[in-house]
Amino acid sequence: MSGHSKWHNIQGRKNAQDAKRGKIFQKLSRELFMAARSGGPDPSSNAALRLIMDKARSANMPKDNIKRAIDKADGSDGANYDEITYEGYAPGGVAVLVHALTDNKNRTSSDVRVAFTRNGGTMGAAGSVAYMFDRRGYIAIAREGLDVDEDQMFEDILEAGADDLQTEEDVFEIYTDPKELANVRDILEKKYTLANAELTMIPQNTTPVDPEKVEQFQRLVDALEDNDDVQDVYTAGELPEEE
């Protein structure tokens, strides 16, 4: 698969995310709530919930927090969220998708627009950049200590039902049809330790970020991710390699 490594993007922001752990738990709680409300509270029959529970555990979210978020889905506390996707461009014309879960659309729309305009970006209309991304299942397997070559891994992921493999120096990145992610994950984790498994949006093509605009680009992404209502930020930006 063409494009930059998603895993390196994940790792590149890990330290910053560690410093925002409370905010991450809040966002995961909303995802758990929505998955449980739409598909039921039993992870054995709700693949989407099972994936988000794994994501929450990977983030070291306490079990009580996970249970509490799922229990709220019975509607007893009146909570509800709308899913909204915002589209726009970062500095240099880099496509950006923003996925939010909000209880106040007007507030979130205003906040996202401000984040774009204050950091050199522009908010786009619905459909302006979404077509540049594909929804995919994504699995990462770290290569450290793993005695498996690319050919063997490719054979294993095809047998599991995945359809693409990107091999990096430190990680195998596996891509699946979104509907097959949970099943592929269940099969692969019988043989491998998975570093990550999630639904994501992958850019069909990447856009190099102008070295002079890297700082502004990262400020925009940070401003969007810092918003309590924003769950995920996807970009087509390819950052220059550090010297």
From Swiss-Prot:
Region annotation Disordered: where it falls in the sequence: 1-21
Chief location category: cytoplasm
Record's GO cellular component terms: cytosol
Single Gene Ontology BP annotation: regulation of DNA-templated transcription
Assigned keywords, A-Z: Cytoplasm, DNA-binding, Transcription, Transcription regulation
Sample GO molecular function, one term: DNA binding
InterPro entries, per database record: Integrase-like_N, TACO1_YebC-like_2nd/3rd_dom, TACO1_YebC_N, Transcrip_reg_TACO1-like, Transcrip_reg_TACO1-like_dom3, YebC-like
Pfam families per record: TACO1_YebC_N (PF20772), Transcrip_reg (PF01709)
Localization of this protein: Cytoplasm
PANTHER family according to UniProt: TRANSCRIPTIONAL REGULATORY PROTEIN YEBC-RELATED, TRANSLATIONAL ACTIVATOR OF CYTOCHROME C OXIDASE 1
Family: Belongs to the TACO1 family.
Protein name, as recorded: Probable transcriptional regulatory protein LCA_1307
